[in-house]
Amino acid sequence: MGEFYNPDKLYKGGSRNNSLINKKMIFRVLGVLLFIESAMFLLCAAVSLCYGEQDYQYFLYTILLNTLVGGVLLICSRGAENRLTRRDGYCIVTFTWFLFTLFGMLPFYFSRGIPSVTDAFFETMSGFTTTGATILDDIESLSHGLLFWRSLTQWIGGLGIVFFTIAVLPIFGGGTIQLFSAEAIGVTHDKTHPRIDVMAKWLWMIYAILTIAETVLLMIGGMSFFDAVCHSFSTTATGGYSTKQASVAYWNSPFIEYVIAIFMILSGINFSLYFMCLKGKGKRLFQDDEFRWFMKSVSILTLVITFALVFQNHYDWEKAFRRALFQVATAHTSCGFATDDYNLWPSFTWMLLIFAMLSGGCTGSTSGGIKNMRLMILARNIKNEFKRMLHPRAVLPVRVNRQVISPSIIASVNTFFVFYLFCILAGWILLMFFGVGIIEAMSTVISSLGNVGPGLGAFGPAFSWAALPDAAKWILSFLMLIGRLELFAVLLLFYSGFWERR
């Protein structure tokens, strides 16, 4: 992927080819990525064979179809110029998630593990976007190969979004994408590495280390190797798919709950901070404004809910703290695991969890939501506005990590926040139009747009989303996609000006 996103080869205004979209280059990238997905299918087929299951044949059917389409795309890409424009970049990231979902649903559908096209697409989109919402009412009935593929979709999706947000977005710049630029707000901390491909390899290595470390700890806690790997895939990606219908509560193990809660939080932190730690600059982690904001929020919400569970639900202190920490970590990092039915908790705690869902994790992590960096900039700008009302002539810049945030970045944050709320409102109204209850509609929309997983009411952590109307599932699948790709990266393709030369 490094050669495709080499900034030295990006279109700067003068090119031998004046076409608006470099279709051949897009075909080449998508073709290569489909071959990579085929390799993942092959791995899942091997898992099925290891367990003596017949589902391997459905993965082989999918591989044949996948490689055929990938091959056609590569043939069509012959003679492609090795350059990409901003438009090409937006097309690639959107089409990649869509095509991966389209082909990724086929093993579920071919095996009849999920016999409905709508449900299979929803389940796979929920996986690749690391949302974790499921339509399955009997997860254990799936074969090991399908369960492995289900968790692997989340690990691939999380891996992809780390590369997308830290390596790809800063190249393109502009609008909300500037939010991730080192020049804009120092998110990548002195340009983590000058070469995008090298930086991506380091980030993927960190991603793999977190996954392996958690797998080992979960096995120590009593999980089988298969379950430990699948849950580590889901945790590191902040996805939330489990191999059990009861999710993590199935094991009823405090050790396992603490391990997963800690790794959810670790996965919600900006991955470039880990890179700085590896370079011997560990102080940067604790000096980072977003990291401190995120940890304060997790700590405060956990303590408040702990007291509520002790004094209103009569939990003992350790259990209350453990359940509160786990569910706050799940909501704040947009992971979909559950150890308790929070529908039975005091109602005010639902609002705290919704706040955590909206906030999400840190920029440059696998988590979803609005992101703490945006909320921090928004809050500091509001604080400055109050000061400006008292001191009209005062110069009050917004600072993050001691760097002044430009007015254009502040404007992009405000725009993103307003548009995020608009998407919630629009999705909420649409779901109620199709017969979903007011609380359920609100929570499933927030959960889907923030890539969280569980909602409230009939679609809370104790229930699947199978009862949703098909139309609602397609709407929520679209919200998952735009939420995963930061709204504008997808919606820009529906703007007429995107396809016009101006």
Briefly describe each language-model feature range.
Residues 1-502:
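Membrane-proximal intracellular helices of multi-pass ion channels
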